[in-house]
């Protein structure tokens, strides 16, 4: 059994595995692995711990800290900052690992823990498996999770200037010859981890900034706001006659943009702009199975290859490393610009689009002219218990028949969510009405067979 999903460990706070007891054990065994792999026995291993704005983050933070300290690991606490800030500061502090307490775009009652390696990238499968194996023995009661020698305990430190360090890092990704003084930008902070740093970065680069959903109270994170609810941003951009809108998700690693006409530009649109309109045209782009066929066609027309990876920024990163490319992402707004940051970073991705606007003197709507997404319909089917739809012959036959029906005009993708008990039914088709009808028919079939 693996406790890790596609993006760390996630669930409902108070229910296994997101409980203080489990998190304490997780901190301890992860600390043990770091101690065992420590190349310098004269120096204790250290980790950086950051979080988003969920109320439960306080409890999880304390449990993790206790676990790591018990294992003999020093802890640098940085408080609420975006996930990519933890990745950056892990490298900056020469820490052995980074830990993020967040459930990303999920509601406040969920939470999770994900890890970064010392280089600021996602933890390797080998390291994750080593943690998982030790964790299993502790959870099952076959191993202890206390430190016998009090002299070997770790310490914890609060890093007071973490926010400023990350702001400077973000600003450093923006070309020095441009500024944002001619732009009015609305930023929707999702009442999440980017509520403070997002607006500050834009202001310090000269933009006139209107911040919305930037008053977190512990339970309003992602609540009808942020990258999963761009409608409030669309309205605000039009009301304020802004040049552009930026929506972050709860942990600040996803971005959705809105142009001056109130039209949403998703991750595919952002990749198109960065690949084709930047001063240095991309050699290739890594997307995912969810990347719209319209992106593939637009990139091909520009002489740029698109490689599809499995869903998840971890797999996009692996694809980029395999090809030696620097640009990749997902329609949901995970955008990786590896020449600027080692992980998906909403603020940095947004700055790269704003840099293209400054460089070309074009509006966001002008930059997406000629870029057309195929109509896409995504229906989520919630299950009591996760199962694989491809284990049901009746469903496999239905999927194959539907794919044959739209061959040459679109595509079908059916997959399990990596973070929730959901089956995602996605249809892309050149006709919007047919697309919607087919997606709901297939979702109803999944419900009927698997419920």
From Swiss-Prot:
Positions of post-translational Phosphoserine modification: 104
EC number: 5.4.2.10
Origin: domain of life: Bacteria
GO biological process terms, semicolon-separated: carbohydrate metabolic process; peptidoglycan biosynthetic process; UDP-N-acetylglucosamine biosynthetic process
Disulphide-bridged cysteine pairs: none
CDD domains reported for this sequence: GlmM
Official protein name in the record: Phosphoglucosamine mutase
């Amino acid at each position: 059994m693996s406790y890790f999903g596609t993006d760390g460990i996630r669930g409902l706070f108070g229910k296994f595995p997101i409980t203080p007891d489990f998190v304490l054990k997780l901190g301890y065994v992860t600390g043990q692995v770091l101690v065992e792999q420590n190349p310098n026995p004269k120096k204790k291993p250290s980790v950086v711990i950051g979080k988003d704005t969920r109320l439960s983050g306080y409890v999880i933070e304390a449990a993790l800290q206790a676990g790591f300290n018990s294992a003999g690991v020093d802890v640098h606490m940085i408080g609420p900052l975006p996930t990519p800030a933890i990745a950056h500061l892990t490298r900056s502090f020469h820490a052995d690992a980074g830990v993020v307490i967040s459930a990303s775009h999920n509601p406040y009652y969920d939470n999770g823990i994900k890890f970064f390696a010392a280089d600021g990238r996602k933890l390797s499968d080998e390291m994750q498996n080593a943690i998982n194996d030790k964790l299993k023995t502790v959870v099952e009661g076959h191993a202890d999770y206390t430190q016998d020698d009090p002299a070997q305990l770790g310490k914890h430190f609060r890093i007071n200037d973490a926010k400023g360090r990350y702001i400077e890092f973000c600003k450093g990704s923006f070309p020095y010859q441009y500024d944002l003084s001619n732009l009015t930008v609305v930023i929707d902070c999702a009442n999440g981890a980017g509520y403070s740093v997002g607006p500050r970065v834009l202001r310090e680069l000269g933009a006139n900034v209107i911040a919305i959903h930037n008053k977190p109270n512990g339970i309003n994170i992602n609540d009808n706001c942020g990258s999963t609810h761009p409608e409030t941003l669309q309205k605000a951009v039009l009301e304020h006659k802004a040049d552009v809108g930026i929506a972050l998700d709860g942990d600040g690693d996803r971005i959705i943009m809105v142009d001056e006409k109130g039209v949403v530009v998703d991750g595919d649109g952002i990749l198109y702009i960065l690949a084709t309109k930047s001063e240095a045209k991309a050699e290739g782009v890594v997307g995912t199975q969810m990347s719209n066929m319209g992106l593939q066609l637009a990139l091909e027309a520009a002489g740029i290859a698109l490689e599809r990876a499995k869903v998840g920024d971890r797999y996009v990163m692996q694809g980029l490393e395999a090809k030696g490319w620097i640009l990749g992402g997902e329609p949901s707004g995970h955008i990786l610009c590896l020449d600027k940051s080692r992980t998906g970073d909403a603020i940095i991705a947004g700055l790269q689009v704003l840099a293209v606007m400054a460089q070309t003197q074009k509006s966001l709507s002008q930059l997406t002219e000629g870029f057309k997404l195929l109509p896409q319909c995504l229906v989520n089917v919630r299950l009591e218990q996760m199962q694989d739809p491809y284990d049901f012959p009746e469903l496999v036959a239905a999927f194959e028949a539907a794919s044959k029906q739209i061959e040459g005009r679109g595509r079908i993708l059916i997959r399990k969510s990596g973070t929730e008990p959901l089956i995602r039914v996605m249809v892309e088709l050149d006709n919007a009405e047919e697309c919607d009808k087919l997606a709901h028919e297939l979702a109803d079939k999944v419900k009927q067979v698997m419920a």
